UniProtKB/Swiss-Prot annotation:
SUPFAM superfamilies: Aldolase (SSF51569). Keywords: Lactose metabolism, Lyase. Pfam families: DeoC. The keyword Lyase applies. It is an enzyme of class 4 (lyase). Disulfide bonds: none annotated. Pathway: Carbohydrate metabolism; D-tagatose 6-phosphate degradation; D-glyceraldehyde 3-phosphate and glycerone phosphate from D-tagatose 6-phosphate: step 2/2. It comes from Staphylococcus aureus (strain COL). Its EC number is 4.1.2.40. This is Tagatose 1,6-diphosphate aldolase.
């Protein structure tokens, strides 16, 4: 699918000079509150959340090609980011209704693609929970929803980054052996689907197609995939889309994420970058709450910097320019 000149220019603002998207993800809301709540008895305040996002933006965006933030708590951080760092803004409400079947998507009601663009976003990001094996009456609603957002982004001439998280209602633990067995097909089939032109997606933000904790050579316990099988799943993922795609870190450690990118590259996956969140900054949360702002800055300038610098070095050796795919 051909992109407009404006969309291409916007994606360039989100990429480094090599055409690789080395983006920092900090649009976490519910997950961040839960992380913070582990280290304090009272409910995290809006001011606390906003300030932590500002700290991360001030200290780390000089090393990232772009940052993903949410318009609920992240706007002060967007103002604090490095002038050369592009901006993605999240359009979805955080989490999903655990009492309703289907994990249906929902936009932030006060926002639109137009308003996110007016706020300075170079792209709109939307997170969708998707199970290719779910009932069609659930999935047709999700497809229609993504078509609406895609059309909105075309109208505003702003890139649409779709993040897809897979699940299976019959397997409550997506870190389990059972889910590891079905994950490759669920991830790759969802990518194939949302690459169709009708959705007007410009970049896919996706999970790696395997759980690396069950890959031979990485696994500490049970092995679900041999190295060859895992490599084939990465190859199949690359073949599933003509669109640029970037990997999310899914909360794994910085080390495991970097090793995963090396494995993907060796398998032949021509991925175009990352949107890496917790693997880079998660250790700052406890320091911020227990020791305060100055200590958190120090953590970000040392460990946080090392995490993002190591990641950038790995990306240089493993990722390919999105311009080769468009």
């Amino acid at each position: 699918m051909s992109k407009s000149n404006q969309k291409i220019a916007s994606i360039e603002q989100l990429s480094n000079n090599e055409g690789i998207i080395s983006a920092l993800a900090f649009d976490q809301r519910g997950a961040l509150k839960r992380m913070m709540a582990k280290h304090q008895t009272e409910e995290p305040t809006v001011a606390q959340i906003e300030q932590l996002k500002v700290l991360v933006a001030e200290e780390l965006t000089q090393y990232a090609s772009s940052i993903l933030l949410d318009p609920e708590y992240g706007l002060p951080a967007s103002d604090a980011r490095n002038k050369d760092c592009g901006l993605l803004l999240a359009y979805e409400k955080t989490g999903y209704d655990v009492n309703a079947k289907g994990r249906l998507p929902d936009c932030l009601v006060e926002w639109s693609a137009k308003r996110l663009k007016e706020q300075g976003a170079n792209a709109v990001k939307f997170l969708l929970y998707y199970d290719v094996d779910d009932a069609e009456e659930i999935n047709i609603q999700k497809k229609a929803y993504i078509e609406r957002i895609g059309s909105e982004c075309v109208a505003e001439d702003i890139p649409f980054f779709l993040e897809v998280l897979t699940y299976d209602d019959n397997i409550p633990d997506n870190g389990s052996v059972e889910f590891a067995k079905v994950k490759p097909r669920k991830v790759n089939e969802a990518m194939k689907l949302f690459s169709e032109p009708r959705f007007n997606v410009d970049v896919l933000k996706v999970e790696v197609p395997v759980n690396m904790k069950y890959v031979e050579g990485f696994a500490e316990g049970e092995v679900v995939y041999t190295k060859e099988e895992a490599a084939q799943h990465f190859k199949d993922q690359d073949a599933a889309t003509h669109l640029p795609y970037i990997y999310l870190s899914a909360g794994v450690s910085a080390e495991l994420f970097q090793e995963t990118l090396k494995f993907a590259h060796e398998a032949g996956a021509k991925f175009n970058g990352v949107l890496c969140g917790r693997a880079t900054w998660s250790g700052a949360v406890q320091v911020y709450i227990e020791q305060g702002e100055d200590a958190a800055r120090e953590w970000l300038r040392t460990t946080g910097f090392k995490n993002i610098d190591d990641l950038n070095k790995v990306l240089k050796d493993t990722a390919t320019s999105w311009k080769q795919r468009k």
